[in-house]
Amino acid sequence: MPPVPLRTATFSTHTCARIVVVCCLLLALGVSSAAQQLPQRDNEKLLAPTPPMGWNSWDSYGENITEAQVRATAEWMAKHLKPYGWQYVVIDEGWYLANPGAKPADLKFVMDDSGRFLPDPSRYPSSVDGAGFKPLADYIHSLGLKFGIHIMRGIPREAVARNLRIAMSPYRASEAAIEDDTCPWNAFMYGVQPAPSGQAYYNSISTLYAQWGVDFIKADCIADHPYKADEMRMLALSIRYTERDIVLSVSPGPTSLEHAKEVSDYAEMWRISDDFWDHWGPLADKPWSQGIRAQFDTAAKWASFHVPGRWPDADMLPLGHFPHPGDGGEARDTHLTHDEQLTMMNLWCIFQSPLIVGGDLPTADDWTTKLLTNPEVIAVDQHASGRKPVVTNETDVVWTSKPEDGRGYYVAVFNLSEKDQTLTYDWTKLELPKATYSVRDLWSAKDLGDATSLMVKLRPHASALYWVVARP
């Protein structure tokens, strides 16, 4: 497909001047030293003061989603989920492919004359004539929501083969690329040099995304296998200098705890596991796929990490229906039982993971909708602190956290076994002060009365979520 012309970006004189200044600094100092400390935002504004909540297209559509489907999803979210805090609509991988699903050697890309991917106009008709994602982003913003896209780290190999000039710079694509560095599962990108030429390319794409009105970037092949700190810094720096508030999410997992400080300097959220899908235990035919049981162990490793506005990400919530599943196969509903779906929600919320739904929203049934619209459960994810596991056995796990207002505790109890269990805990066993506590079930929104200890009857893979407050 021939390159698509791009409308000229319009920025304030101040913004253009800042972009020029940063490029000059990078030329003088080198990327590695200049990018170690990102320039501060005004008043150190947190772009994600609470865990981001939204929807991502991958679980439902893989690379095959269309503009019509994105718009329908945004409309459903605005009507049903927005009042509960859900706000991001994110298009995952492949929006620039003219032939999604083709063999890797046959993939056809849509890009401009500066080597920047553009939406495929056959699937995103509002992007014609170089409009890019701006019309779609404008529509999503008109609904009171925010718009996000997935990118692969690096620069397109096709841009390097054609040696295209990088926008707003004296460099060409071949000067920015590391041609022996490709992503293990998507080889159509080259890594980018930790040098002014590489920074120039990241500046060029972030400038374009800011022009479109992007609010969220999910950057892939950067957080683990392989971990690319230099490219993460360059991307974060380029986003900062657009002067647009853009949340940065990095993938895939498992992000190493050794990199926690560095990653949290540059991204608002990062994946803690391999791709999470709708199963309990490991799958022999998909060893890369993380199930719920393993996610308990992964979350526990990150429990002590607490940085304001930075969120370890347990991955998307595979709920509801998948018309074109991102993990392959025919259209299907989630494989998780109702008990397992509740357990997933309870773990994500008590852990305070970002909540990013993966299922198809316009076809969501009443059960799925209710899972996503319980304000008391959502508050556990959004408005708590001090999350930690206090019981970690092979058969049962308990987490606690404290509500934002300091009144009482949230307690999540999980049966990890394959049989019914009656679990009893003294409050002190849960690291709570010895007292009589009033107990409220957050899913049923019912007060259960006072208790001197906690007793819970749970089916296999089931869980419960409570708010408990000590009596005077």
Language-model features: where?
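Structural recognition of the beta-strand scaffold that forms the well-ordered cores
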Residues: P52-S57, Q87-D92, L97, K146-I151, ...
